[in-house]
Design a protein with these regions (language model features):
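Short helix-capping/linker segments at secondary-structure and domain boundaries
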Residues: 180-184, 279-290, 321, 353, ...
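Conserved hydrophobic/aromatic beta-strand scaffold that supports enzyme active sites
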Residues: 175, 187, 310-312, 498-500
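Active-site histidine-anchored catalytic micro-motif
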Residues: 32-279, 283-285, 294-301
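N-terminal secretory signal peptides that target proteins for export/translocation
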Residues: 1-5
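Basic nucleic-acid-binding interfaces
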Residues: 322-519
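Long, Lys/Arg- and hydrophobic-enriched amphipathic alpha-helices
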Residues: 286, 291-324
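Bacterial Sec-dependent signal peptides at the C-terminal "C-region" and cleavage site
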Residues: 7-8, 12-34
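Short glycine-rich loop/turn motifs
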Residues: 73-74, 170-173, 310, 369-374
Length: 519
């Protein structure tokens, strides 16, 4: 979350904080005095006694039972709440890392208390925990910040006080000390949570570490915050479904936290660090996301009224790049129902001047959360087209929304009038998750749609467009660039991301033909 959390609110996840007095960090910047970040949450989030802390981690690791991953682990995610709450989940990440010989850890974390608008790479010499000091790889840090103006050497987000006991980096360190032994640390706290900042960090890390096999990139993040148990599970599984589908672009634009009891679309306080880690991992050859363990604080305490979600995840380089996104299909009846809903939604908003409220759908497919576009045509010509690229609402609600918006909010056209309603033809495109294109030769005209993004410029073309226009792959790429308001050769720019997707596309004529064929 790109906000400074209220320290009192965080007591839900770590009630022991209310009983503790924190000492401000000691720092003497004069002369050659090392700049060492002292432990701020030892004794609250985890034991301050080294022996007790070591024994607790050993016990949690021993209980983290699961098959050992054989593929190379390129990056990972671990939660950062108090060990009594998130430790049983975090242990699953660290159990997989045990025995690996990483000499450097790049630890990417969110800020909970201090607001700033850049990515803060720690400018000090060490972090300290009850298990000892962890030295900073200062040369790596200096190289990294030179890669992008979004990054700075700074102690913003790293320093802690009694009023702002930042913990998102610190909580991970005793785990790393136990499972890796000696290593150098590059601690990073992200104040700017935009996709551009996550991309800049992920790409920069991949460039520096291109031939490095001894560095671990770790994202520090919890999931949803302070919702009733059942709501939290639903929100968290949306996030984890997108993670496993490798749709980090949709994750980045849909992470949000509105406040206690107000569910966001997807939630993770370390959403930007997760996205940065995925972008890095992808460019290093990772092609699968594995969720090792999910739970929330209610599973530990038994209090289901307001919980915090946790997951342990790794990004691996597997022989097969197959994601867990299941094939999606619709029956003729479901397609017909969606088209009827689109027409009803447009007619209702044009005639009544407010959105149609459809009855709940009994179809499991129509209740799946899916991205979709609704296209309106009149006499064969485009009359409006708007959609959601991300799976943020049940499909039938997405169709209601996008049909309504296509008729009333498409900036290329005036609003649909009542006299046009009988002339409109409807087409719906139900989208798969987005996946970045690493080789344009893999783009299949008629199968893939494209989304092109470079900075603030962004444009999308559906899979049916190049077929209708009789374009080849090269022209399809150029036209998507132009749709984004960029040069026609923007797709060759290393700063341009190309995302592809597939779609289930159907119009009223298609459904009538399909229905006739089944008789």
């Amino acid at each position: 979350m790109n906000i400074a959390m209220n320290p009192t609110a965080y007591l839900i996840a770590a009630p022991l904080l209310a009983l503790l007095v924190f000492s401000p960090l000691k720092h003497d910047s004069s002369g050659d005095q090392p700049k060492v970040r002292q432990a701020a949450v030892a004794g609250s989030f985890y034991p301050a006694d080294p022996k007790e802390l070591s024994a607790m981690i050993d016990d949690l690791l021993a209980k983290a039972q699961g098959p050992q991953i054989s593929e190379p682990i390129i990056a990972a995610v671990a939660p950062h709440a108090g060990y009594v709450y998130s430790g049983p989940v975090a242990a699953y990440t660290y159990a997989q890392l045990k025995g690996h010989k990483y000499s450097r850890v790049v630890l990417i974390a969110p800020t909970h208390y201090v607001g700033f608008d850049f990515t803060s790479v720690y400018d000090g010499d060490a972090y300290t925990t009850p298990l000892g000091q962890v030295p900073i790889d200062k040369e790596f840090a200096r190289r990294l910040v030179k890669m992008s103006s979004t990054m700075q050497l700074s102690d913003k987000g790293h320093q802690a006080t009694s009023d702002a006991p930042e913990h998102s980096v610190e909580v991970q360190l005793p785990w790393l000390q136990k499972v890796l032994g000696n290593f150098e640390l590059v601690p990073i706290v992200m104040g700017d949570t935009s996709y551009e900042s996550s991309r800049a960090l992920g790409v920069a890390l991949a460039k520096i570490l291109r031939d490095d096999h001894n560095t671990l990139v770790l994202a520090s993040s919890d999931l949803s915050h302070y919702h009733p148990y059942d709501d939290a599970v639903k929100i968290d599984h949306k996030t984890l479904n997108a993670l496993q589908a490798w749709d980090y672009f949709s994750m980045s634009r849909n992470f949000q936290w509105r406040g206690p009891g107000q569910p966001g679309i997807w939630e993770a306080c370390g959403g930007a660090p997760i996205v940065a880690a995925m972008i890095y991992a992808e460019r290093m050859g990772a092609n699968q996301a594995r969720v090792l363990k999910y739970a929330n604080s209610g599973d530990i305490t038994g209090d289901h009224s307001r919980v915090v979600g946790y997951s342990a995840d790794v990004f691996v380089k597997a022989e097969s790049s197959k994601t867990v996104d299941a094939p999606f299909s619709l029956t003729v009846e479901e397609k017909s129902n969606l088209l009827a809903l689109a027409r009803k939604s447009v007619e209702y908003v044009v005639q009544q001047r407010y959105p149609y409220e459809p009855p709940a759908s009994a179809s499991s497919s129509l209740n799946q959360e899916r991205g979709a576009f609704t296209t309106l045509k009149e006499a064969g010509e485009l009359r409006g087209c708007i959609g959601y690229t991300s799976a943020v609402k049940p499909l039938y609600i997405t169709v209601r929304d996008t049909a309504t918006l296509a008729a009333t909010q498409d900036p290329r056209f005036p609003q649909v009038t009542a006299s046009e309603l009988p002339k409109l033809e409807y087409e719906i495109s139900v989208l798969s998750p987005l996946r970045r294109v690493t080789d344009v030769q893999q783009i299949v005209v008629g199968q893939h749609g494209l989304l092109m993004k470079n900075g603030d410029s962004e444009g999308l073309l559906l899979p049916q467009v190049p077929v209708e226009q009789q374009w080849d792959r090269h022209t399809f790429l150029e036209q998507t660039c132009r749709k984004a308001g960029m040069r026609s050769d923007c797709w060759m720019d290393e700063d341009t991301d190309i995302f592809s997707f597939t779609a289930v596309v159907f119009g009223e004529r298609d459904v009538h033909r399909e229905a006739d064929n089944t008789k």
